[in-house]
Amino acid sequence: MTAQSQNIVETPSRVRAHALGVNAPELAKYQDEPAQMRSGAVGKSGYLKLRFAKREHCSILAEMERRVPSLVQKALYWDEEIPELPCVTMISTSGCILQGDRLATDVHVEAGACAHVTTQSATKVHMMNANYASQIQNFIVEEGGYLEFMSDPLIPHRNSRFITDTTISIHPTATAIYSEVLMSGRKYHHADERFGFDVYSSRVAAQNLAGKELFVEKYVLEPKVESLDAVGVMQTFDAFGNVILLTPKEHHDRILARVPAHFDIKGGDCQRRDAST
């Protein structure tokens, strides 16, 4: 067993990232291996582990582990409204997500700590002629913790296939904000780029720290099988944003009152809110 294989076996989220798409029905047609380099090989099995802890005057990035092509360098404190908030930018040394990539991220916010995690720029899922790319994300937010995970948009190129699975484990007193933004593609690059990807599959689940399920949502987009321009799907819009807020009820009600539902087809703006406690 190689050193990389041993490290993968010893890291549950990396094991899941390698296995995620194997039995997924939506990816059954895309199990062939790339001719250039096999899936999950060195440089194609990325991993990030970030652990945030509370100190006297601020929270810190107390532990970090990284495997190419995933990279984090250090936490910065640039939020003037929350000066004790460590802000971390995730970087891809490959520039984009490629066929055969297997990516995993573990973020742990300890009791009373806070963190903001984002990306360096929009994430591009490159054109593919074999296999697919997969991603596992695990977030743990302990008692009184606060996590913002606000990634930049994901842009799937034509003929790309991407599957992502996110699990948020959270204490009832903690708060987590998670967002994902999906673009229609490089619509000004080529006529076939707008909704030209093969598969986009996303699953997001939340649970308490004891493992009790709070919610699960999954959607699979296959624009070459069924048009996404239909009414009730994307219609004429080119960006889909999904923001999930998990917070104690006293915060939830106050925030919800300030975020009304909104639909403006001429202005290209549609905002729907789903209330749950």
Curated annotation (Swiss-Prot):
| Pfam families listed in its UniProt record | UreD (PF01774)
Identify the main location: cytoplasm
Cellular-component GO terms for this entry = cytoplasm
List the subcellular locations: Cytoplasm
The terms under GO molecular function for this entry are: nickel cation binding
Whether Chaperone counts among this entry's keywords is yes
Swiss-Prot/TrEMBL keywords: Chaperone, Cytoplasm, Nickel insertion
Keyword Chaperone assigned to the entry: answer is yes
Query: Any idea what job this protein has?
Result: Required for maturation of urease via the functional incorporation of the urease nickel metallocenter.
UniProt family annotation: Belongs to the UreD family.
The family database entries (PANTHER family) matched by this protein are listed as: UREASE ACCESSORY PROTEIN D
Summarize subunit and interaction data from the UniProt record for this chain: UreD, UreF and UreG form a complex that acts as a GTP-hydrolysis-dependent molecular chaperone, activating the urease apoprotein by helping to assemble the nickel containing metallocenter of UreC. The UreE protein probably delivers the nickel.
| Identification of the protein by name | Urease accessory protein UreD
What organism does the UniProt record list as the source? Yersinia pestis (strain Pestoides F)
